[in-house]
Amino acid sequence: MYAVVTGSTKGIGLAVLRQLASEGWNVAASSRNHEDLQRVKLDIESLPGNPKCFIHTVDFSHKEETIRYGQHLLEELPQIDLLINNAGVFYPGSVHQEDDGVLEDTMALNLFSPYHLTRTLLPSMMGRRKGHIINVCSIASFMAYPNGGAYTISKFALLGLSKALREEMKPYGIRVTSVMPGATWSASWGDAPYPDDRLMPPEDVAEIIVSTTRLSAASAVEEIIIRPQLGDL
């Protein structure tokens, strides 16, 4: 089985990659940082079972580069069973104060890149009448919060893309799952003054995501909401 995970060198993406590989999946990892990808490849391919890890340096904020990556995957991999659109960006700011261009930059990575990558890979899945697409959205996909202007807009839109794909892909046997995690530990939190149990470990989110791939073809998990036990920050 072959899985494609974008934004897969840290946080939720890396945790998902490791969980999949530990369960026998071969994985394709992508990031803008080639050194990080090389480190991930060594880590993944050292796991029991000798999983393969295909790495590619990609800037998903560029449409043409995203499409080229998808086309390369179709040539390199024997099939694509699972696509996890995880790459994303967050720029804090309110709609009326954020810099000009922040919305466009945020939408390019959080919405347009999964849109174009999914469209590139879908014909292969549809031809096989088999596949699974998982979009890593956010609790910001259904609720707004202060200082989350462009990010909230982009994540609402990503959930809309997921819902549209879910309806379109039912006849083709392709499952579509939207995952809405709350605050999850990652490097982006830096030295944030929170105790360990205030944010979720990415491994918990990864376990939930990967669990949806174990179901029979008769079942589909449409949406998952996972939050810190103590609630949102």
Identify the meaning behind each predicted range.
Residues S138:
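Residue(s) in the substrate-gating loop at a strand-loop-helix junction
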Residues E23-R39:
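Conserved glycine-rich Rossmann-like NAD(P)H-binding loop of the short-chain dehydrogenase/reductase
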Residues T9-K10:
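Conserved glycine-rich cofactor-binding loop
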